């Protein structure tokens, strides 16, 4: 029996269905002498995947599916993985275009899907003419997950660190993304940058969905596979996980931008451009540099490196 350890930190609002899918997959694989063990991270579990992998005693998995982007973007974490990864990017054909171009991270990470962040607003005309860096009073949320971090990194790369600081100073930043959505519903803010699944609840009379002028801000997820298992099995697992069934489910139920080309349905937020930090810029950003700014402006933010110190 071949044992495979998969770490999973993905789409929390669809997690019940994700778990049902993975339970069924694990059961099917048993007939082929494959024992799939899935360890879950994120909302509803004790820790995020990046927090666990940062620990000195962390056990490395065979496979990862993660929208916790610090796993891949924090060089102090990714260095534990990047010397033992297969070139998975070529294993599954993906839909080309600006949505994919924005999230490419090299040959060792296979883009799975992206959560598009768009405006949920009472002021659509202002949204149409306001750059992401120019907002005063914008709500957005997810302090200790990838949502706020990606917005901050996007602004930082395009407009500089001072622009990122100003955005945090002038915004209503909530613990989780739905908190920003609720801030607009409760009229604590006029506009929120939220997952499109929330913004689609706009009634078209008092509240509206508006794509940012720069395009949606993308929160991507990636699949990667370590050389701890044979390549043939790793490749099979990529195809089993990024299968038409799960991809179509994500597109239909989450309004997610799903990259495998066999996906039949597209997100309504696909656009001529998109915002996401680039791989070369992320490679230059140090842990200390990012978290110094981030934690200084957001007292609720946690820095795993500081948390590990005795």
Predicted regions and their residues:
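Extracellular/periplasmic juxtamembrane helices and adjacent flexible linkers that interface
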Residues: 232, 240-310
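Ligand-binding cleft/hinge of the Venus flytrap
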Residues: 23-30, 118-174
């Amino acid at each position: 029996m071949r044992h495979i350890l998969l770490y999973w930190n993905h789409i929390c609002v669809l997690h019940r269905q994700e778990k049902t899918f993975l339970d069924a997959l694990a059961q099917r694989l048993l007939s082929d002498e494959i024992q799939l063990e899935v360890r879950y991270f994120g909302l509803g579990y004790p820790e995020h995947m990046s927090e666990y992998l940062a620990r000195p005693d962390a056990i490395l998995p065979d496979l990862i599916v993660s929208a916790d982007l610090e796993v891949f973007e924090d060089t102090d974490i990714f260095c534990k993985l990047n010397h033992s990864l297969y070139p998975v990017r070529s294993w599954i054909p993906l839909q080309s275009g600006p949505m994919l171009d924005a999230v490419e991270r090299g040959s060792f990470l296979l883009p799975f899907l992206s959560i598009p962040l768009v405006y949920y607003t009472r002021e659509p005309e202002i949204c149409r003419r306001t750059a992401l860096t120019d907002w005063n009073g914008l709500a957005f949320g997810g302090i200790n997950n990838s949502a706020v971090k990606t917005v901050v990194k996007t602004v930082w790369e395009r407009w500089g660190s001072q622009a990122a600081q100003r955005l945090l100073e002038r915004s209503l930043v909530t613990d989780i993304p739905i908190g920003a959505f609720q801030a607009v519903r409760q009229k604590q803010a006029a506009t929120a940058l939220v997952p499109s699944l929330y913004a689609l609840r706009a009634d078209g009379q008092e509240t509206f969905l508006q794509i940012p002028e720069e395009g949606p801000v993308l929160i991507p997820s990636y699949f990667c596979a370590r050389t701890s298992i044979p390549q043939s099995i790793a490749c099979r697992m990529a195809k089993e996980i990024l299968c038409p069934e799960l991809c179509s489910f994500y597109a239909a139920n989450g309004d997610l931008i799903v990259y495998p080309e066999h996906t039949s349905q597209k997100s309504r937020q696909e656009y001529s451009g998109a915002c996401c930090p680039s791989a070369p810029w992320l490679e230059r950003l140090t842990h200390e540099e990012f978290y110094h700014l981030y934690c200084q402006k957001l007292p609720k933010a946690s820095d795993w490196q500081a948390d590990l110190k005795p």
